[in-house]
Amino acid sequence: MSSVVVLGAQWGDEGKGKIVDYLAQKADAVVRYSGGSNAGHTVVVNNINYKLRLLPSGVLFNDKTNVLGNGVVINPGVVLAEIAGMKEKGIDCSNLVISDRAHVVLPYHQRLDELQEEALGNHKI
């Protein structure tokens, strides 16, 4: 059994999604192990655009297991909307597994972040 790991070193803008989509064609599983919904890439299949933020691109293949792992930061609203969007385009996401140890971002987390940034005033990063 062999494994292929796609790892980025340019703050997420180096085109990992396109490479993973290509490699997913021959993979048994596509696993996302970290990151959140600030990521994103577009995959085009049969002239249909699929915009992915949290879901692994393997969801476009019925015979692949797709995993959102322990280190993924999941905003439930975002992942549910993304699944609904896939369903509207005829993609069945029942091949998706979400770790029970994945991190969950709730609205109060986002509000706390906003308040902390506001409190920094001119000293923001």
Q: For the regions a protein language model found, what residue spans apply to each?
A:
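Non-transmembrane, aqueous-exposed alpha-helical and coiled segments at domain scale
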Residues: 1-125
